[in-house]
């Protein structure tokens, strides 16, 4: 059985050795909840990796959003290259749930775009949990949403051993049951092709290997893994297990039982609606449900089949849905990153979903059983959560209430101390900030400025630009690709000042930033709470000359607590450095590292990454494009590559190609 093997050239330092020891001790003592209170840049992920290696337990890592999940995935993948590090997030690039607006009598159909690559990674994640102990699954709050039950999923699994007696037609029927499709032309994920007695199958959870089964007289003579692109055989296999294309696949007999249950509920609901004289709703419900039943009987599924999940999984009314947590072994470990954000998210999901569905049920678009197609409630999530470690620089009230032990990780391995915090009058904040920016720019350093409103951020950006400051503005309308580009440009020195509203949310990691300016710091509220202030101040904690300036006319309670906590940490860090003769060193981080994990690559997309180098060297051969026709053709080629990178979440590579396309378009106009 494989064990976790941590691969790193670093040794735990600063507060890390003691934090690792205490966390491991707490897990082995059976503590249900612990908190790792780790400051920005203290190496919390490295500490958790050491804990995982020592306790040797399958681990679920919960992040507050896809971007941070991707970063964590990249970091854990680097720490555990020989183990199963998987990525389980929502596979929707775009999702519009069905909804009804009674005030305007508007029904909005469900509309969604599924990311095929992330769907493959989700299947790979559950396969890893079912097959091996050395699994780390990095996920978001999507893990509390309904998933096919592991019992039903495992019933559908197809095992093939070398030497098995196996009729070819029976094998093809079983593959069809797993929702695999036969395709002789386009050999892609979850398809198979037949050439005489040779059957090539591309597993649903794989993006780099296909399986070849060779039959001889209804006996499995050979099983091999091969490259679906080149046909190169990697290795011979004694056996292989094929998993369904979807977590929601259901055996035929279960479908037939479900149909009977749905018919029974439909009959009861129609009686209720007729008695209430809701004739339009009754007619609508009957028409929609009977159409769905016909589709299920004919095809095995229908659009919106998840609304009948209670019957498909055999659950009683009101029971929690099967989720990713049902795939975890009993001794698993749960790590909640940025827990002050992640934990409240879990509670919010159920309420929003319930409100929308109740309207659909009331107006005859869905039956009451659709309410059981839902995320877990907060109390249900608490019941199924294994031993938990909350990880945050600013733990929230839930962590304070539940943590059996709080482990501090305040001293950084680099010896860097928290930034000095200074309070200055708000009256002259803009002019004072401008003079501070000039000092930092002269020293080759960068500045973050955070405001309260979008309008003020825009006005401040305009004002600084008018005074010859190279400034950019980061706001919610900027998509992920462009956000990565802006952050990279700041680090490269393309501009010097980044203005935003809620910069802490981005999980920014920029050692070049030496000053964080918080304007109107005394305006109490979400953006100026104690936790928000500590998080924002921490953005300057990776620079040797880090400093934070809070512009305020009054010192609020939140400000005072944030300043006191920063000062407490700073004193502890300085005392540790003096006692151990440590000279603080600045963090040196490659510019390309900023979104290392966001690529969430399989081996195939890793190979594609080499294409990004072409973007860097492109100037050399773009000069060879002479005619407008050649330039137009080149733009089309690059646009296709850019969209592929975006689909694979390789945002930096996509951003590079976008810049190149813009340059070519300028050439096209000028020519």
Curated annotation (Swiss-Prot):
InterPro entries per UniProt: Helicase/UvrB_N (IPR006935), Helicase_ATP-bd (IPR014001), Helicase_C-like (IPR001650), P-loop_NTPase (IPR027417), UVR_dom (IPR001943), UVR_dom_sf (IPR036876), UvrB (IPR004807), UvrB_inter (IPR041471)
Q: Which PANTHER family is this protein grouped with?
A: UVRABC SYSTEM PROTEIN B
Main function: The UvrABC repair system catalyzes the recognition and processing of DNA lesions. A damage recognition complex composed of 2 UvrA and 2 UvrB subunits scans DNA for abnormalities. Upon binding of the UvrA(2)B(2) complex to a putative damaged site, the DNA wraps around one UvrB monomer. DNA wrap is dependent on ATP binding by UvrB and probably causes local melting of the DNA helix, facilitating insertion of UvrB beta-hairpin between the DNA strands. Then UvrB probes one DNA strand for the presence of a lesion.
**Record bears the keyword Cytoplasm:** yes
From which residue to which does the signal peptide run? none
MF terms per GO, please?
Answer: ATP binding; ATP hydrolysis activity; DNA binding; excinuclease ABC activity
A Pfam family (short name) is UvrB
Please tell me which stretches of this chain the record labels as motif Beta-hairpin: 91-114
Name the positions where ATP binds.
38-45
Q: Which residues form the Helicase C-terminal domain?
A: 429-582
Q: Which NCBIfam families match?
A: PRK05298.1, uvrb
Protein name per Swiss-Prot or TrEMBL = UvrABC system protein B
The record's similarity note reads: Belongs to the UvrB family.
**Which comment does the entry carry about domains?**
The beta-hairpin motif is involved in DNA binding.
Domain Helicase ATP-binding, residue spans = 25-412
Subunit notes for this chain? Forms a heterotetramer with UvrA during the search for lesions. Interacts with UvrC in an incision complex.
Occurrences of domain UVR (ranges) = 632-667
Q: Name one GO cellular component term.
A: excinuclease repair complex
One biological process term in Gene Ontology: nucleotide-excision repair
Q: Where in the cell is it found?
A: Cytoplasm
Q: Which UniProt keywords apply?
A: ATP-binding, Cytoplasm, DNA damage, DNA excision, DNA repair, Excision nuclease, Nucleotide-binding, SOS response
